[in-house]
Design a protein with these regions (language model features):
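An edge-strand/N-cap motif at the start of beta-rich repeat modules
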Residues: 1-21
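Short glycine/acidic-enriched loop and turn motifs that connect beta-strands
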Residues: 8-11, 56-62, 111-114, 169-171, ...
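Beta-rich, blade/repeat-based domains predominating
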Residues: 11, 36-46, 89-104, 136-159, ...
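A short beta-strand motif characteristic of beta-propeller blades
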Residues: 28-34, 81-86, 137-143, 185-191, ...
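Blade-loop segments of beta-propeller domains
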Residues: 29-102
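Blade-level signature of beta-propeller repeat domains, shared across WD40, Kelch, NHL, RCC1
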Residues: 315-355
Length: 355
């Protein structure tokens, strides 16, 4: 099953779920749950029984904050049932993740410039935030970087740290993370070139390397990751474009292939997926391909857990296209299949035990 988070212009829009034919790459609509506002970014519980979505809004009840919603997943059909909702403690939550134990949802608030963790009950319901950290400061490009903008949050391979890319600060902030209590505590940061605009972040399957995609400069930073100390040491900066940056261009998503040999990043405006080969000894990147996403504004994409297909989500053209992945080169090839989904923002895969 493939779940698609979206921006909602009407009450009828919401979270979509699709079936992916693993033989051909064909996508077919399976269901939709409407009624929630801007369930843009999604995360699936490690036990595969629950799904969580940010509600990317600025006002939740009496707070200047967004929200996070919890859903149960029907193990046979993949259908979602709303469970409950809690404040994200900051405005416009745009990214979330569950820790490895499934006890906590960690959320990044973009306009709020903050992060929070919300405990998860055994029945999948969310409890009020157990930890909240407000970022402060600014960076080079005003007004874009006049304030902090937490754009993503990831949990380290050892489940000991939370790593936050802040577009407004040009920093990747590291927090010690206690999964039992859901507490985050500051543990340092890595700076990037001023004006870069850190957006999304991905760890290598080996746990040795990490990758940051920068929205404003359309670059990738390669880091060595020290799980013992929670330290990031920069190795390389490489452009995501094969040409000079043009007006209206920006990056969006970054993901590492499950086999750890390739990395993918999306370029909005240029409307491509950049493919890179990963040096297995050093973690450094070398460019392989720039594949058109066949639509406009690839805000997100997903790689299926087997590593066979990539699904590109084109926000502005309202469509998703599937691409087969060459296991030897990492190159993408269109399957010829696509499907219309209004304003897609996030792609998440789930292999249902009941299927």
């Amino acid at each position: 099953m493939v779940y698609i988070g979206t921006y909602t212009r009407t009450e009828e829009q919401g979270i979509h779920w699709l079936k992916l034919d693993m033989g051909t790459g064909k996508l077919t609509a399976s269901g939709k749950l409407s009624g929630q506002k801007n369930p843009s970014f999604l995360a699936i519980h490690p036990n595969k029984k629950f799904l969580y979505a940010v509600n990317e809004i600025g006002n939740y009840k009496d707070e200047k904050a967004g929200a996070v919603s919890a859903y149960s997943i029907d193990q046979k059909t993949g259908a979602l049932t709303f469970l409950n909702q809690q404040s994200s403690k900051g405005g416009a939550p745009c990214h979330l993740v569950l820790d490895a134990t499934g006890r906590n949802v960690l959320v990044a608030n973009y306009t709020g410039g903050s992060v929070a963790s919300l405990p998860v009950s055994r029945k999948g319901r969310l409890r009020p935030a157990s930890s909240f950290i407000q970022h402060t400061g600014s960076s080079l490009l005003k007004p874009r970087q006049a304030a902090p903008h937490s754009h993503s949050i990831n949990v380290s391979p050892g489940n000991k740290f939370a790593v936050v890319a802040d577009l407004g600060l040009d920093r990747v902030l590291v927090y010690g993370f206690d999964s039992k209590g859901g507490k985050m505590t500051p543990a340092g940061f890595a700076k990037v070139t001023p004006g870069s605009g850190p957006r999304h972040f991905a760890f290598h399957p080996s746990g040795k390397f990490a990758y940051l995609i920068n929205e404003i400069t359309l670059t990738l930073n390669v880091f060595v990751w020290d799980e013992m100390r929670g330290k990031l040491n920069e190795l390389q900066t490489i452009a995501t474009l094969p040409v000079e940056r043009g007006k209206g261009m920006s990056t969006a998503e970054v993901q590492v292939h499950p086999n750890g040999r390739f990395l993918y990043g999306s370029n909005r405006g240029h409307d491509t997926i950049a493919v890179f080969r990963i040096d297995q000894k050093t973690g450094k990147l070398s460019a392989v391909q720039h594949q058109s996403t066949l639509g406009k504004t690839p805000r997100n994409f997903g790689i299926d857990p087997t590593g066979k297909y990539l699904i590109a989500a084109n926000q502005s053209s309202g469509d998703l296209f599937t691409f087969s992945i060459n296991r030897d080169s990492g190159e993408l090839k269109p399957t010829g299949y696509s499907i219309k989904v209004p304003m897609p923002v996030c792609v998440k895969f789930l292999d249902l035990p009941g299927k």
